[in-house]
């Protein structure tokens, strides 16, 4: 159990049997009565953000969340097939649960998977990945007046905007949160 004094951004709590993540919180004391804590909570299951107010010292539950190291094996229809690195059990995770992160996965890649009551909820990828450009248009000479970009298809199939000097076969660093080009490797 957590007390409201334990609240901080990113803390995961359970309320009415549903796991939430604290997005924002603020302690306040009204003119009359005890102190209160206003929170913005993100429902981990569906992503909705709700406001909730707690009395100071109120207790809330800890969700049954677990983070495990797994290896991405392959796609099967709309599912990702992952293997637990400790038990070697295979786990199926629907692609919609990944918020588009599945586009960064290569066969054999190691990822962290967030589980709630044994069911997969989310993938945790590194902040940046190095991927190879498999398809892009050649840059035009002299077209460097401003910050010009062009689309480039990467080895995992996702398309990102890259500067014109990036060519097919180059290995580039990509931010997995914003899908932005970070530099060449």
Swiss-Prot record:
InterPro entries: Elong-fact-P_C, NA-bd_OB-fold, Rib_uL2_dom2, Transl_elong_fac_P/YeiP, Transl_elong_KOW-like, Transl_elong_P/YeiP_cen, Transl_elong_P/YeiP_CS, Transl_elongation_fac_P. One of its GO terms (molecular function) is translation elongation factor activity. It is found in: Cytoplasm. One of its GO terms (biological process) is peptide biosynthetic process. It comes from the Bacteria. The keyword NADP does not apply. Pfam families: EFP, EFP_N, Elong-fact-P_C. Pathway: Protein biosynthesis; polypeptide chain elongation. Keywords: Cytoplasm, Elongation factor, Protein biosynthesis. Its main location: cytoplasm. One of its GO terms (cellular component) is cytoplasm. Transmembrane segments: none annotated. Gene3D superfamilies: 2.30.30.30, Nucleic acid-binding proteins. PANTHER family: ELONGATION FACTOR P, ELONGATION FACTOR P (EF-P) FAMILY PROTEIN. Belongs to the elongation factor P family. Involved in peptide bond synthesis. Stimulates efficient translation and peptide-bond synthesis on native or reconstituted 70S ribosomes in vitro. Probably functions indirectly by altering the affinity of the ribosome for aminoacyl-tRNA, thus increasing their reactivity as acceptors for peptidyl transferase. This is Elongation factor P. The gene is efp.
